[in-house]
Amino acid sequence: MEIKQLFALSVALLMAFPAFADNYPIVSPTVEYTDSTGVLIIKHTSESFTEQAPLTIRFKANPENTAGYTMNYQWTINNTKDPSFNIVNYTEEFEQTFTRAGEFSIKLLYTYTDADGKQMSEQTDSIKFTIKESKLDFPNAFSPNGDRLNDKYKAKVCQSIVEFRASIYNRWGKKLYSWTDPYDGWDGTFNGKPVKQGVYFVNVVAKGADGHEYHIRRDVNLLRGYTEVTNTTTP
């Protein structure tokens, strides 16, 4: 008799709380991005990471067991160092590009409603990441001689640069080359032909993810007869 009563009580509880009788919806949020080496990185809740700007991230809720339920999502992204920064998104999956330095926290609140209109909400653990502050510096010489070592004049330090323009001039002030990709550079040519060895001038205007503005102007020594030497032996 006692067993029958316990069974009846269990059935009654399951009928009163159908979410526990079936597999109710769950989410497994992830963030995906490609790092500076071209590798796809996937992070989950309670994980953290550090990257540089600009950084484009795809946010995915990855819901399961949603049959028979209506799903609603609310992503919240905050910059803990900048209270004015706040992003809210209501889609299951979306992309966002980050161009500011700071420490960011991502949370997902999801709500599921069954056919009878009963609704439940749950919030996931946060995913945290840091966008590095900016750095930018250029060398004063390069040697475009085909040895694949220092063949292109480009930044020797580059981190979290979100706006960039550089131009090369000869000693008479003629512009020879310009580029807008902070990881690109000048190969020592003008109109497809190598320029002479000598001193040139670079002008760089850039802005970092931390708001820092760069104005770099300096001489550039182009050394055609110079060969880079690398030490391949262990001292």
Q: Where are the regions that the model predicts?
A:
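Bacterial N-terminal signal peptides that target proteins for export
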Residues: 1-7
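N-terminal signal peptide c-region/cleavage motif recognized by signal peptidases
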Residues: 16-18
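Proline-enriched interdomain boundary motifs that mark the N-terminal boundary
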Residues: 23-45, 134-139
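Short loop/turn motifs at secondary-structure boundaries
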Residues: 44-49, 53-63, 128-235
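Surface-exposed, flexible coil segments in extracellular/virion-facing regions
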Residues: 67-96
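Solvent-exposed segments in extracellular or luminal domains encompassing
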Residues: 85-105, 184-187
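Short, aromatic- and glycine-rich surface loops/edge beta-strands on solvent-exposed regions
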Residues: 103-114, 198-204
